[in-house]
């Protein structure tokens, strides 16, 4: 039976030797009156002078042009039920009174960028300017890159890669599509 007792290990608290007492230093008392103890005492006194009775630090000073704000009041959580589950949701806080209740932040930004508000009919349309005509452009063109002026837009007469002539009524989108296809099929580097 004694063998089974020895095989079981049990933990027990050690007792301190009789000659040694545990130190009982509290935060306010320091062992000797040396220079180190005086420095620590002064540090503790300075730090505790900033504490309130509750142990909280005093509020930080307000920045210039910043009025102190009260803590935002949180609206009560709303509940909604889906099937047998009930969910809680805290709604967003209401906008501050200075921003206006109905207009969003993007409206304020857009009106500030525009510098004006109102409907577009109140303002004159901007002046439309066309592209320069072919006569105003210096012509250093090769025959394959000959351009004509149609409605103020410059168009190519032929493809610079495969030399195919474009039909006179061909839309710019069709010309761009042909050029893209030629570029995709081409393995040569073309300098424009």
UniProtKB/Swiss-Prot annotation:
Complex and partners: Component of the Fanconi anemia (FA) complex. Interacts with FANCA; interaction is direct. Interacts with REV1.
Organism name: Bos taurus (Bovine)
Domain of life: Eukaryota
Any Pfam family matching the protein: UBZ_FAAP20
Segments forming UBZ2-type zinc fingers: 156-192
Biased composition, class Basic and acidic residues, residue ranges: 66-76
Function: Component of the Fanconi anemia (FA) complex required to recruit the FA complex to DNA interstrand cross-links (ICLs) and promote ICLs repair. Following DNA damage recognizes and binds 'Lys-63'-linked ubiquitin generated by RNF8 at ICLs and recruits other components of the FA complex. Promotes translesion synthesis via interaction with REV1.
Localization (cell): Nucleus; Chromosome
Residue spans of biased composition, Basic residues class: 1-16
Region (Disordered): 1-34, 51-151
GO CC, one annotated term: Fanconi anaemia nuclear complex
PANTHER family (alphabetical): FANCONI ANEMIA CORE COMPLEX-ASSOCIATED PROTEIN 20
Residue positions, PTM Phosphoserine: 119, 149
Keywords: Chromosome, DNA damage, DNA repair, Metal-binding, Nucleus, Phosphoprotein, Zinc, Zinc-finger
Start-end of Low complexity biased regions: 132-149
UniProt remark on domains: The UBZ2-type zinc finger binds both 'Lys-48'- and 'Lys-63'-linked polyubiquitin with preference for 'Lys-63'-linked polyubiquitin.
Molecular function terms from GO: K63-linked polyubiquitin modification-dependent protein binding; polyubiquitin modification-dependent protein binding; ubiquitin binding; ubiquitin-modified protein reader activity; zinc ion binding
Residues that coordinate or bind Zn(2+): 159, 162, 178, 182
Name of the protein described by the UniProt record: Fanconi anemia core complex-associated protein 20
């Amino acid at each position: 039976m004694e063998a089974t007792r020895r095989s079981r290990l049990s933990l027990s608290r050690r007792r301190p030797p009789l000659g040694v007492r545990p130190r009982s230093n509290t935060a306010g008392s320091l062992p000797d009156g040396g220079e180190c103890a005086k420095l620590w005492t002064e540090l503790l006194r300075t730090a505790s002078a900033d504490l309130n009775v509750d142990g909280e630090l005093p509020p930080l000073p307000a920045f210039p042009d910043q009025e102190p704000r009260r803590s935002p009041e949180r609206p009560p959580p709303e509940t909604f039920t889906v099937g047998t589950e009930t969910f809680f949701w805290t709604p967003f806080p209401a906008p501050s009174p200075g921003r206006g209740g109905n207009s969003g932040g993007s409206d304020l930004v857009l009106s500030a960028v525009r510098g004006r508000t109102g409907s577009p009919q109140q303002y004159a349309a901007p002046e439309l300017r066309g592209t320069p005509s072919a006569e105003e452009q210096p012509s250093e063109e090769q025959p394959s890159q000959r351009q004509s002026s149609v409605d103020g837009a410059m168009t190519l007469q032929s493809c610079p890669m495969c030399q195919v002539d474009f039909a006179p009524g061909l839309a710019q989108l069709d010309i761009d599509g042909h050029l893209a296809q030629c570029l995709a099929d081409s393995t040569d580097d073309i300098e424009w």
